[in-house]
């Protein structure tokens, strides 16, 4: 007998006990290397924007309209129309978005992948996506799954008589799951009192989370932890919807508008429902939740466990939701699956059955629906919408557009003929460039003016970084375009050293005015461009100080936003609570500073080598917040040297923590005991973490002087242009 037949083959690559099992607190750099070309099946020269522009969008919409009423035996349509199912699919695709870090949302089509494809709140959406496959198959690469999911929701609304606000394509598919923090609970739908709860205090939801339980999009429809209390549920609704950038009016419009259509499904006990897609057998082919209750579909379907139809027009836009909400008193009951829900007292049977035209039912509501009546603020808005149907329709159209486009970033990324003409404040509008751009000669002249202005390398670099590093690759917000660093709230953020920033901006504005006043023919430089250009001049000068010649690329074309074009409250979420690139922590956090650095780097779409080069360079250029000396491992400040790495890796230095929290360290000369340097956790991680140390050793080597400078410039230029979608 051969060895192969004796021994079971159980040692495949990637299996076995992992590093994470051995060292659960080890810094995870994997999030910096997601969504690379290695997982993307598209050709290297594939341009999705160009592919989408060739799409016959009207033909796609026509096919989607036909699908709405083409009920399939394997998953029959409620009321003969898939509209309600597809509205829920689109809502749940977009509704994972949260403002705190911009993660989640419809971009990338993440609903196709774990964990979202198997969340308890997404039961049966596997069927919705499978219904769409023939259309996706037909149009192929010209429409992404991410775009198709949202377009289908829009067409569903339109097919049921609702006029939508518009639609934009441009969401590029991802090909692997995002690595997003959805909570620490180990059990789906874990209650708030359980281990690793996301709640503290009276009911304070952990940031950045925007859902009340693991596996839910927003709130528990039965009420907080399943307690059927509409007033208490209103607290959860307000908190979670606000964390998705929705105010009270938008929240009411979305709930009432969405619940005008379709129904929930709770025909029988949840014990009849099988494993979710990620745990189902191969034979299920990516589907999940196979039910043994009756036929397991149609009238026997089990999704949320609730059995509610809100309106008498579940496939047609109407004002029935508010009519029923206010026309009846409501009594608590339970669904056939045992879930808490509400039924109208003394109401007639006015609600159609989803599959039997001879049957009617009394109106039913969810606990969270009744919140719109029994919360005083929601009730006021709800009555106004009830009495003014046109206002309600407009509010829902706008809120739905915001919900489904919030994570797309600026209008420059919007594609297609259905993009609405109106510019909206939440899109962080930036005026179109209305002047002739500066040329190479102007760039050189402006660099000279900036360097002669009295501003230091540190000031130039720090200001450019502060302007550009607000960018978030998650929701494409922030960045240098718009020069919002000179506006509230950014100009007042602690990390930006407001008093120092004001001096720098005043000097740069003087350079800008002198240049613009001297021009003829309409040529101008925007402050947004000048801030980035000044940073480039600072980096070039720093490299020169180190004996290296570099040219930082520069592309003009940024414009200056106004205060009126800036939503102060919405912009406030971009304020860094931590920026390891500037050695900044606003407060002490439970999450280690080095993990916050990696999180920031991921939002900046940086790789581990890019992050390493930027930290090492920014330290020696004096970009620390508050001019702190931690991590400034050089006696040649404002020179773009590799001193940070050389001195960090020097075995002549012994490091010891000097704070109770182990977040400040002193590096002493091993021979004399003299303090040589001070550093933060962010600084020391580049010598402690094996993978980061390997990168630090590259840049700390004797032959790395020029390589480091050029790598820093490349990473710097990347950050400066992250929001330049016009250059893509």
Curated annotation (Swiss-Prot):
Heme b binds at residue 259. It catalyses: H2O2 + AH2 = A + 2 H2O; 2 H2O2 = O2 + 2 H2O. There is a cross-link at residues 91-218 (Tryptophyl-tyrosyl-methioninium (Trp-Tyr) (with M-244)). The record marks 88 as: Transition state stabilizer. Its EC number is 1.11.1.21. Transmembrane segments: none annotated. GO terms for molecular function: catalase activity; heme binding; metal ion binding. Keywords: Heme, Hydrogen peroxide, Iron, Metal-binding, Oxidoreductase, Peroxidase. GO terms for biological process: cellular response to hydrogen peroxide; hydrogen peroxide catabolic process. The keyword Heme applies. Belongs to the peroxidase family. Peroxidase/catalase subfamily. Homodimer or homotetramer. This is Catalase-peroxidase. It comes from Burkholderia lata (strain ATCC 17760 / DSM 23089 / LMG 22485 / NCIMB 9086 / R18194 / 383).
């Amino acid at each position: 007998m051969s060895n192969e037949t004796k021994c079971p083959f159980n040692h495949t690559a990637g299996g076995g006990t992992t590093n994470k099992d051995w060292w659960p607190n080890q810094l995870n750099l994997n999030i910096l290397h997601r969504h690379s070309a290695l997982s993307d099946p598209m050709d290297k020269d594939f341009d999705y924007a160009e592919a989408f522009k060739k799409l016959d969008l009207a033909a796609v919409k026509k096919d989607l309209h036909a699908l709405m009423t083409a009920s399939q035996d394997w998953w029959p349509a409620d009321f003969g129309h898939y509209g309600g199912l597809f509205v829920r699919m689109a809502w749940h695709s977009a509704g994972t978005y949260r403002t705190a870090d911009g993660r989640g949302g419809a971009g990338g089509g993440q609903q196709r992948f774990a964990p979202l494809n198997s969340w308890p709140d997404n039961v049966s959406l596997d069927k919705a996506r499978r219904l769409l496959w023939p259309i996706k198959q037909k149009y192929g690469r010209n429409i992404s799954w991410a775009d198709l999911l949202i377009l289908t929701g829009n067409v569903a609304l339109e097919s049921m008589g609702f006029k939508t606000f518009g639609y934009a394509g441009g969401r590029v598919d991802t090909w692997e799951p995002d690595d997003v923090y959805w909570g620490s609970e180990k059990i789906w739908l874990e209650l708030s009192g359980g281990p690793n709860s996301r709640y503290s205090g009276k009911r304070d939801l952990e940031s950045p989370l925007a859902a009340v339980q693991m596996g839910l999009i927003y709130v528990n429809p039965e009420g907080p932890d399943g307690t059927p209390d509409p007033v208490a549920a209103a607290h959860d609704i307000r908190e979670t919807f606000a964390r998705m950038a929705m105010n009270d009016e938008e929240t009411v419009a979305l709930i009432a508008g969405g619940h005008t259509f379709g129904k929930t499904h709770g025909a029988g006990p949840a014990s009849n429902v099988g494993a979710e897609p990620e745990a189902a057998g191969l034979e299920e082919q990516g589907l999940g939740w196979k039910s043994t209750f009756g036929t397991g579909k149609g009238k026997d379907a089990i999704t949320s466990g609730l059995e509610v139809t809100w309106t008498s027009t579940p496939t047609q836009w109407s004002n029935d939701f508010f009519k029923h909400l206010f026309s009846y008193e409501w009594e608590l009951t339970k669904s056939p699956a045992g879930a808490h829900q509400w039924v109208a007292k003394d109401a007639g049977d006015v609600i159609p059955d989803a599959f039997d035209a001879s049957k009617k039912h009394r109106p039913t509501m969810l606990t969270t629906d009744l919140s719109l009546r029994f919360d005083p603020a929601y009730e006021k808005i709800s009555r106004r919408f009830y009495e003014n149907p046109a206002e309600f329709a407009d509010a829902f159209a706008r809120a739905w557009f915001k919900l489904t486009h919030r994570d797309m970033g600026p209008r420059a990324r919007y594609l297609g003929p259905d993009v609405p003409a109106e510019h909206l404040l939440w899109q962080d509008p930036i005026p179109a460039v209305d002047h002739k751009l500066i040329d190479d000669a102007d760039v050189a002249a402006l660099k000279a003016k900036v360097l002669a202005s009295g501003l230091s390398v540190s000031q130039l670099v720090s200001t450019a970084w502060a302007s550009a590093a607000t960018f978030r690759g998650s929701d494409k917000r922030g960045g240098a375009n718009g020069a919002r660093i000179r506006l509230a709230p950014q100009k007042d953020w602690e990390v930006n050293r407001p008093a120092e920033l004001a001096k720098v901006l005043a000097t740069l504005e003087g350079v800008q005015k002198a240049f613009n006043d001297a021009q003829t023919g309409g040529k101008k430089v925007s402050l947004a461009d000048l801030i980035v250009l000044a940073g480039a001049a600072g980096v070039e000068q720093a490299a020169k100080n180190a004996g290296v010649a570099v040219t930082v690329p520069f592309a003009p074309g940024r414009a200056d936003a106004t205060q009126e074009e800036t939503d102060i409250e919405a912009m406030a979420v971009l304020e860094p609570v931590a920026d390891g690139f500037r050695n900044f922590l606003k407060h002490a956090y439970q999450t280690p500073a080095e993990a916050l650095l990696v999180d920031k780097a991921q939002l900046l779409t940086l790789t581990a080598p890019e992050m390493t080069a930027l930290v090492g360079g920014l330290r020696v250029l004096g970009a620390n917040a508050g001019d702190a000396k931690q991590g400034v491992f050089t006696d040649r400040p404002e020179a773009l040297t590799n001193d940070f790495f050389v001195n960090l890796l020097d075995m002549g230095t012994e490091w010891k923590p000097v704070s109770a929290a182990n977040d400040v360290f002193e590096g002493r000369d091993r021979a004399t005991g003299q303090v040589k340097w001070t550093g933060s956790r962010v600084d020391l991680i580049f010598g402690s973490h094996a993978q980061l140390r390997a990168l630090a050793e590259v840049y700390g080597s004797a032959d790395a002087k020029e390589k480091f400078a050029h790598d820093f410039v490349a990473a710097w230029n990347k950050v400066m242009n992250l929001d330049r979608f016009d250059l893509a």
